[in-house]
Amino acid sequence: MIVLLSGAKKNIGDFLITERARRLFDYILDDQIIILDRFKNLESDIDLINSARFLVLCGGPAYARDIYKGIYPLVEDLTKIKVPIIPFGLGWCGKPSDPMQFSFNSDSKRLL
């Protein structure tokens, strides 16, 4: 089983990224795929997530200062997630004209 986190309810780009990830993993791994809402806290889904092969973060302007807890709330304690976390098609929220000014907050650095 694979768990995908999707923000597809917010925009079509996230839907397309999630759908492509679903098709790709279905084709390559022929495995059960579960799609969860990336906007919610996942405490109640932690057993499901930890029974998966891995957790995939699908789309969104996620490479942002607050990727963890802001863009992807996940769980309060990251050590509860025992499977690999894989980014797939994540966008960047920095300014192309000044990339050196971009940084992650301390919570996000723990996720990365």
What would you call each of these model-derived segments?
Residues 1-112:
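Aromatic- and Gly/Pro-rich donor/ligand-binding loops
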